[in-house]
Amino acid sequence: MANYTKKVQTTRNKVEIKGINQYNTPILTNNPETNWAINSSISKKIYRFSLKLNTHLNWLNYIQTVNKITTINDKNNQKIGFSLKTAYRKWPDFNIGYTKGFNQLSGLTKTAYSSDEINADFELTFLKFWTYKMEYQNLKNTNSMNQSNFYEVANTSIRYQKNNNPFEFEIFANNLLDNKVKNNYSFSDYMTTEQITYVLPRIFILSVTYKL
């Protein structure tokens, strides 16, 4: 699916930066703004697996004022990914995916970064009443100066419940790899920011549920 949007009047923030402080003033302007977006998805069953390809492309052109300097900006991003999952009822549920991303911003300065993301999840029911789950994600960001950050997170759980039994027992292990921080790059309308999120350490939880 392709989408094209053009605006002849836009509301954008007029940005003023003083030291560590930033002041945003929304203003209505006659500056044009154009946006192209293309999204596509193709899936194919191969033997007992399902293969899916995804594409997301976006190009945005707009005018931005920062510290009384007005520039024509381009903010673009492209993502291409695939996923493979089992499609056979007698097999465990397994899904793995990879996404490659490219991001560019030009205006007062030019910058870019790329990303590599892997996601996987697994679910297995065994001995009738037991269910095991595993989730995994990693993300690597690399900027235009070839500097990179990386994080990976894994969560797992095992659940036991008999049929028609109101009791359910489950053990969770969150942040199994004991990752300390989560890093990510993002674009505002005029700059790149690196966000660092501190995450809870590895934790184990025992859950007992009674369903009325």
What are these model-predicted stretches?
Residues 1-212:
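Exposed, low-structure sequence patches enriched in small/polar residues
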